[in-house]
Amino acid sequence: MDSPSAPVPAHKLVDRLKDQTPRHPSPQPTHVSYPKVNGNGHRVLRSATVGYVAPVFQGKAEQMKQVKNIIVQGGWIPETLVDGQIAWFYNELGIDDVYFQLENPQAVANHITSLYAAKVAAFSREDKREEIRLDMEASDHAIYIDTSEPGMTSFDGPRYEHRLESKYLDGDDTSKRFRVETFRSPGVLGQKENSKAALRCYFVYQCLFVDSNADPKETRLEVISDRMFLAKATKNTKQIYQDIIQVAVSRHGPVIEVFDIEGSEEMRLVVAFRSRTAKGIFSALSDLYHYYGVTSSRKYVEQFSNGITVMSIYLRPAANIDGKHPPLEQSIHQITKEISLLYCLPQNKFHNMFASGELSLQETIYAHCVWVFVQHFLNRLGTEYTSLIAALDPKNNSHVEILSKMKKRLRTETFTPDYILEIISSHPQLVRALYASFASVHLRVGSDYDRHLIAPTPVMEVLSDARLKEKITKDVSNEHEEMVMTAFRVFNNAVLKTNFFTPTKVALSFRLNPSFLPEVEYPKPLYGMFLVITSESRGFHLRFKDIARGGIRIVKSRSKEAYQINARNLFDENYGLASTQQRKNKDIPEGGSKGVILLDPKQQDRHREAFEKYIDSILDLLLKAETPGIKNPIVDLYGKEEILFMGPDENTADLVDWATEHARARGAPWWKSFFTGKSPRLGGIPHDSYGMTTLSVREYVKGIYRKLELDPSKIRKMQTGGPDGDLGSNEILLSNETYTAIVDGSGVLCDPNGIDKDELRRLAKARAMISNFDIAKLSKDGYRVLCDDTNVTLPNGEVVHNGTAFRNTYHLRDNGITDMFVPCGGRPESIDLSSVNKLIKDGKSTIPYIVEGANLFITQDAKLRLEEAGCIVYKDASANKGGVTSSSLEVLASLSFDDKGFVTHMCHDSRGNAPEFYQAYVKEVQNKIQDNARLEFEAIWREHEQTGLPRSVLSDKLSLAITSLDEDLQRSELWDNEKIRRSVLADALPNLLINKIGLDTIIERVPDSYLRAIFGSYLASRFVYEFGSSPSQFAFYDFMSKRMGNINKE
């Protein structure tokens, strides 16, 4: 913190204010806060003499003389009118003295002259409307003056609120923060009787904080405030801000306060929220209160260095608005409820329809959410595609390739996001009817609604689903429109619960019934599905079983084109990852799940905010709401308790601790097991630190060498996913092969004579990309091509024109220097049916062995083509399962220990020292990962030799056999046999846990459903690994007879 005596940068206003007395009130009325509450629950502000106090500008009279001289010399304004124009500008517009102190006489003269010119220009207009517009923008402050009608949103002209918002409030430079003051002139412009327009003045100033690096939890105004705010704000105003900031620092959504002003028709609305979490909300708030026939006399935006923004708006009924509007108190009540909805999506895709009054805020945000839904789930393949599948031979590679290409083509053409937007925008009445149906189910009306009931949307008859279907058919004009609008009905019928109507939300989340998904595209039915929409992103969470585990990944896009591709593939990629996880989780109690968050094109640096909103909004649907007014109960059509188990994935490893602590702060009883991969101080077992995923991958690599009696040191190896990644770095550190190529996010590193191992290990330990490789350690045939490189000549004379394109396709090159390929990173489907032929030469695979460490790197049909060409392929669902085993055993420990035991035995102390039990438990987890990997490797190798079936098929067959038997066993009578149950659990649970806690205590603490899952998965996996995926009908009897014999001996 800055010390009181520390020198601070010069600040023109603050320096002038230091010792100025006396000060007089601002020309705008301001008010003092008293701890008095009236009948509507608002605090009451009584005095009109305090609030913001403008400093007296002692040099004002002298400045006016200088301004007059400049204007007269300019000659643009008739000399007889100069005094009147100056007096009007200085005294009638309500401009604060701060402006006159900050500006030099020349700038003031220019502004007065410009305003006069606007009046002259208006005189020549046919409608004689005076439209005065003025702007002055500098790097540290700005001024905007515009003509506006109270209570009306203008769609023409410069739209200064949007401009100052995008340039100053939501600007890209996060080191600069700006405060805003805006006033409306008391009188109207023009001489005409029906003139309604007034001048609106905006003043923007760069903040100069007392302590610019304040802690996010700091709330003392004397530490976190801007110096100009401290100089201008009175004691009572500071108290209002102090109170709301103290609440805001512990809240993730907006905090809203309303103050009545005694003896006035005005009310003061104060909104506090975390800075830069709601881009566009300043101008959107104006649209919101205009919708309810309300206007503002003054607005302030104050920034604080702890990361909080506070907006203070003085509201009154807009007297000039025609039409019926509710009383101010009721309008304000509705506005405060809708601010949390606006905060979630300040600028939705249909916002202009709200600003123009065509649709309500709820209707436009609902339409935006369904617009997102439609992009992912409009059934674009149709019945013709289903017929084609039936007609073609799935075993014929050329047929499969045709289907694959047709599926991609059908999904990319016709229904673009813009086309869907255009269709929805052309049917506002249908949107209104469909929203009414949605709200009739999910809007819970309580006493809070009864007291201030006004219709937030025009009254609409709620139609049944059948009547909605008829209305859609009747209103639309073609098949495409019917498909899009019918998707609204699909969405409404799929929503089981949502936080759409709960206060203080930060994003919109929907728990959907996934039964609407077409079986032909998604053959394995999902158990659960969440859709989350934030102002920065969209995302899904999918799971295949009630108790399921999987990571949360954030997808970034390097360009708009990359975003469009990522958006198109988002759900399919999520489904594929969750499906892989389901197969990968065969050895553990949990089924497969996955969460994917896609950042919007202009929000690529907002991954933390997107993740936090995603987690918090999902928690809204998992936790029981017990704080009325903050988290109200929701309509729950699902009707059962749900728990999600999550973990780290791409771009989320550093966010896991926050998610764990946030779940604890929100009162989740399962906070210890909510996320795995958390830091050791919270009892986590970091996969990267202990190489958990790599240990499993290495068992498959070593297994191939063992079976074929190969010398690893003579194996030439290629790897995607470099030394900067979790899996890539540990693969380098544990390997003993000769690396010939590494591809990572920065580019390609290749050396046919072998890449220097010591230099690679140095990068792996530092988690550095290959861009940091010392190229002096390459041989004469080696090279490095970075993504940003162009026109690079390789040692063999080949010219690389584009480094990024070279990086993206390097793994497909036939250069004859790769024996073993281990993908440890890279985008899904990097090798598919259309590209796999580049790895096949004269019917033979150019790479003999592939162990797929990265999820979904190779499509299933491409794997089969490679195996057909003689390649030994072990797929991701088999090889990459070490992390899930570690995560599962981490959760088991958190469920088995009580809170005190968990902290003692699983959490590192403040100095980073690991408890003795923790160290031993990690070793047991590592051994378990290697044992499970060896068991599956041997089972697949053995069954391949017996049946000749491709290993990629056998991997899936084993997974399916285990998961199917697992489900049967959990429901079987075997679970009811106490001897068998205890015997299996004793074998399945880690010995260390049993010795430390005791089997009986573990059984008592761990939920019954979780114990059943442990029982089923252990028995099923051990049986299938021993007897194969297609055992005889007597095999299980033999297996259990042997186990019963052992039990009886005990």
Curated annotation (Swiss-Prot):
One of its GO terms (molecular function) is glutamate dehydrogenase (NAD+) activity. It is an enzyme of class 1 (oxidoreductase). InterPro entries: Aminoacid_DH-like_N_sf, Glu/Leu/Phe/Val/Trp_DH_C, Glu/Leu/Phe/Val_DH_AS, NAD(P)-bd_dom_sf, NAD-GDH_2nd, NAD-GDH_euk, NAD-GDH_N. Residues 1-39 are annotated as: Disordered. It holds the Pfam family GDH_2nd. GO terms for biological process: glutamate catabolic process. Its EC number is 1.4.1.2. SUPFAM superfamilies: Aminoacid dehydrogenase-like, N-terminal domain, NAD(P)-binding Rossmann-fold domains. Belongs to the Glu/Leu/Phe/Val dehydrogenases family. Homotetramer. This is NAD-specific glutamate dehydrogenase.
